[in-house]
Amino acid sequence: MLELRLVQGSLLKKVMDSIKDLVNDANFDCSATGFSLQAMDSSHVALVAVLLRSEGFEHYRCDRNISMGMNLGNMAKMLKCAGNDDIITIKADDGSDTVTFMFESPTQDKIADFEMKLMDIDSEHLGIPEAEYHAIVRMPSAEFARICKDLSSIGDTVVISVTKEGVKFSTRGDIGTANIVCRQNTTVDKPEEATVIEMNEPVSLTFALRYMNSFTKASPLSSTVTISLSSELPVVVEYKIAEMGYIRFYLAPKIEEEEDESKP
């Protein structure tokens, strides 16, 4: 038997909105410690990992580890029917091929339940090794989203370069080039508006902007974003989910082809 009651139902809606365009179908894994998801996007370029820890739920019952295969587009449609202030309960019986979402208004005068069929999804669980990163950048999530949006009107890739001076986002396209530099500033009154850079060594990597723009859909979950970079590893773009957990996006860097490679 599985029963999870989340008072802040809007959190689950925001999580779904941030991943539904990236991943079609995925397994939600429930254990005694939390509710999690790990899935590759359809083109196997990006990986998303979500964790909602059990202590963040008002009520959390998971008698045994259970994996529920769901179509994320369909799940998002159901969650759209919940009000932003609604309490969301997720229920599934052992051996059942359905999951029930229950939405209660805060005043308890309206209760809706939606049942959805589960799917059998083959998915290998990828071990994500803990790594030491060359550079870690923490910055306002709205700022990062704005930079990715602005640069994608010029080019389709972004070069993220971290030096002790700051972090630089650059692109080039048919109409020209663009460079945006964010310097470290920790003196702001509000910590969520700070840009903090931890650098062991300089790093410069190229990524597809369409994925970065997709990741920034998670901005409503957190006022800050953490970007972890290392030359031989995928970038990790992480948004903390209140006190409950996180959503992490992993994206392999693009290898820049040598321009003169094709010449005889």
Swiss-Prot record:
<comment type="similarity">
    <text>Belongs to the PCNA family.</text>
</comment>
<keyword id="KW-0235">DNA replication</keyword>
<dbReference type="Pfam" id="PF02747">
    <property type="entry name" value="PCNA_C"/>
</dbReference>
<keyword id="KW-0238">DNA-binding</keyword>
<dbReference type="GO" id="GO:0006275">
    <property type="term" value="P:regulation of DNA replication"/>
</dbReference>
<dbReference type="GO" id="GO:0043626">
    <property type="term" value="C:PCNA complex"/>
</dbReference>
<comment type="function">
    <text>This protein is an auxiliary protein of DNA polymerase delta and is involved in the control of eukaryotic DNA replication by increasing the polymerase's processibility during elongation of the leading strand.</text>
</comment>
<dbReference type="InterPro" id="IPR022649">
    <property type="entry name" value="Pr_cel_nuc_antig_C"/>
</dbReference>
<dbReference type="InterPro" id="IPR022659">
    <property type="entry name" value="Pr_cel_nuc_antig_CS"/>
</dbReference>
<dbReference type="Pfam" id="PF00705">
    <property type="entry name" value="PCNA_N"/>
</dbReference>
<dbReference type="GO" id="GO:0006298">
    <property type="term" value="P:mismatch repair"/>
</dbReference>
<dbReference type="GO" id="GO:0003677">
    <property type="term" value="F:DNA binding"/>
</dbReference>
<dbReference type="InterPro" id="IPR000730">
    <property type="entry name" value="Pr_cel_nuc_antig"/>
</dbReference>
<protein>
    <recommendedName>
        <fullName>Proliferating cell nuclear antigen</fullName>
    </recommendedName>
</protein>
<dbReference type="GO" id="GO:0006272">
    <property type="term" value="P:leading strand elongation"/>
</dbReference>
<dbReference type="InterPro" id="IPR046938">
    <property type="entry name" value="DNA_clamp_sf"/>
</dbReference>
<keyword id="KW-0539">Nucleus</keyword>
<dbReference type="GO" id="GO:0030337">
    <property type="term" value="F:DNA polymerase processivity factor activity"/>
</dbReference>
<dbReference type="InterPro" id="IPR022648">
    <property type="entry name" value="Pr_cel_nuc_antig_N"/>
</dbReference>
<dbReference type="GO" id="GO:0019985">
    <property type="term" value="P:translesion synthesis"/>
</dbReference>
<feature type="DNA-binding region">
    <location>
        <begin position="61"/>
        <end position="80"/>
    </location>
</feature>
